[in-house]
Design a protein with these regions (language model features):
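Class I SAM-dependent methyltransferase SAM/SAH-binding core
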Residues: 48, 52-98
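Core SAM-dependent methyltransferase catalytic element
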Residues: 194, 258-269
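C-terminal helical/coil "lid" or tail adjacent to the Rossmann-like core of SAM-dependent
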Residues: 10, 14-17, 28, 198-254
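A short SAM/SAH-binding and catalytic strip from SAM-dependent methyltransferases
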Residues: 105-120
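Conserved catalytic/acceptor-binding region of the Class I
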Residues: 137-212
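A short glycine-rich, Lys/Arg-flanked "PGG" loop and its adjoining helix->strand segment in the class I
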Residues: 120-135
């Protein structure tokens, strides 16, 4: 996940981004790690982690590739990347050429392309940077306009307020240039139409309970998105109440399904 952008990236704030990256790693890393293990990252692999964030997946790629491997971890803001042994590079995947060290056997990006209006051009760039037989792994969350289903709550009013909040977040993302449904609707087809084979998607979803990692993310979003939420009719009292709702262990909801779409560059001459 990239942590800075010249576009209207919706999530911002230094303290909030640190907390957000930590919570996202807790929520999403197990599924990403499982996906990469299933692909069979070979020893000595050359890997590129796009939008490396805090560096957790770069560290995982380093472990899979082993001592003879190479991992390049890029982001617009590299200050948070903690991946000893990786080559860390400030890089804008929209405009900068692919980093040195390729062609790559594995390229991974999570929660990056959905935020970029130039996502299809970036996808083509990533495909071009693959070695023959190399894998591209793009992970996005399936974010629908209906928001997140609530499973348990202490009151119908809490369900209504959280539903209004989660639907507003989707609209705020879209207004900032993101395509919240890219991962579920268009990504698989876009990869299949490129020079990739064995394209397949894996969907994973989990519930979260008040006070856990999912709760932390929603609490962070009430702070990061306070201005656009207030512009959509939320009051300070609403946002304070939301922070209490998502911290309540009696509250639980589904998380956005993580869609991992993988494709391999043809090895034919």
């Amino acid at each position: 996940m990239s942590t800075a952008s010249e576009t209207q990236y919706a999530f911002h704030g230094a303290v909030e981004v640190d907390d957000q990256l930590d919570a996202l790693e807790t929520m999403l890393d197990p599924g990403t790690a499982e996906c990469l293990v299933r692909l069979g990252v070979p020893a000595g692999a050359r890997c590129w982690e796009v939008g490396a964030g805090g560096g957790s997946i770069a560290r995982h790629l380093l472990a899979l590739a082993g001592p003879g491997g190479r991992v390049v971890a890029t982001d617009l803001d590299t200050s948070r990347i903690a991946a000893p042994g990786a080559e860390i590079l400030q890089h804008d995947v929209r405009w900068d050429p692919a980093p040195d060290g390729g062609p790559f056997d594995v390229i991974h990006a999570r929660w990056v392309l959905m935020h970029l209006p130039e996502r299809r051009r970036v996808l083509s760039k990533l495909v071009d940077a693959l070695a023959p037989g190399g894998w591209l792994v793009i992970e996005e969350s399936m974010v629908t306009p209906e928001g997140l289903p609530v499973l348990t709550s202490s009151s119908p009013a809490d369900v209504e307020l959280f539903g209004r909040f989660s639907r507003a977040v989707v609209r705020i993302l879209a207004d900032a240039g993101a395509d919240p449904q890219w991962g579920a609707r268009d990504l698989h087809a876009a990869m299949a139409e490129s020079s990739l084979e064995d394209v397949h998607s894996i969907h994973r979803t989990d519930s979260w309970t008040g006070g856990g990692a999912g709760s932390r993310l929603h609490d962070i979003h009430t702070r990061q998105l306070r201005e656009p939420l207030c512009a959509r009719g939320f009051t300070d009292s609403d946002l304070d109440r939301l922070q209490n709702i998502v911290a309540d262990p009696r509250f639980s909801a589904m998380w956005y399904p993580l869609v991992s779409t993988c494709g391999r560059k043809t090895s034919r001459a």
